[in-house]
Amino acid sequence: MKKLFLLAAVMLSSVGAFAQHAVGSFTLQPRLGINIATVTDLDRTKSRVDFAGGLEAEYQVSDLFSLSGGLMYSRQGFKMEDVNLPVVGTVKKGDSWTPSYLNIPIMANVYVVKGLAVKLGIQPGFVVDKDDADHMETFDFSIPVGLSYEYQNVVFDARYNWGLTKIYDVDKLDSKNSVFQITLGYKFDL
């Protein structure tokens, strides 16, 4: 965590940094991509790849800084090995658990060179499909950290969503979401 703050401080002190859009402007960005998702604190699980998509609005505060907020549909979860889990019972190798979330990323974006932004924020999320897991929490909270690059309004975004809240309502499990998300979007000036 200390390294992350140090990296952010170094990026903030960069000279000659500027954004793609005029100060005071708003943009709207539809985004589509993939999640590479798993959970912490569960043995014999593997990452799974699934869909992510949504919409993000951004306000350009200065040449160096913008704020954004969005609504993302995110299929997360994990693949399993042969194991008996207290949450879902006995599962076979290769089975997947695939809850769907509506996440609300609220991000601070620091532009270090034209088009390149370092991102840090908060992300509340709400489960919209539990995939038949009765002991699953319906609220999730994570810290997204990432980078994006914009060229001619096309934006490539890569971020890691570090889950802070337990996803199961089971005392024996302290599992949290761990999601790497890659999306491609297009910024429309408003």
Residue ranges and their predicted role:
Residues 27, 45-90:
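Glycine- and aromatic-enriched membrane insertion/assembly motifs of diderm outer-membrane
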Residues 38-46, 75-100, 126-141, 166-180:
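Flexible, solvent-exposed loop segments that connect beta-strands
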Residues 87-120:
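Short, structured interface segments that constitute the first stable element of a domain
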Residues 21-23, 62, 113-115, 151-154, ...:
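Outer-membrane beta-barrel channels and translocator barrels
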Residues 48-52, 62-66, 99-103, 113-117, ...:
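Short connector loops at helix/strand junctions that flank enzyme active sites
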Residues 30-36, 53-59, 63, 71-73, ...:
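Residues on the lipid-exposed face of transmembrane beta-strands in outer-membrane beta-barrel proteins
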Residues 1-31, 184, 188-190:
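Bacterial Sec-dependent N-terminal signal peptides
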